[in-house]
Amino acid sequence: MRLQTLVLAALAAVAAAVPAAAATVRVTVTKLTFEPAQVSAHVGDTIEWVNADFLAHSATDRKKEWDLFIAPNKSVHVTVTKPDEIDYYCRFHPNMVGHISVTP
């Protein structure tokens, strides 16, 4: 009985130590908007912007941690590394805004 308890405790510890798989959160740039404009992610996830527009755009963090140029019909990405509330915009079209909520 004691061995069974030790084995179960060891398995629980290993399961708790395995991190969840990182996800990719996609934002499409189209018609001078970010779609969706608000997304949620976890630390370690990747945010991918896909420019489906015929114009160049950017995804520029208002805190100046990143500034990504997005050519027409191309994509760019950033991996979020800490819990945060991130507001971003397109520096070519400042009315284009988005928000990323990053949780642990």
Kindly give the residue locations of the regions a language model identified.
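Extracytoplasmic copper-binding redox domains, predominantly the cupredoxin/blue-copper superfamily
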Residues: R2-A13, V18-P104
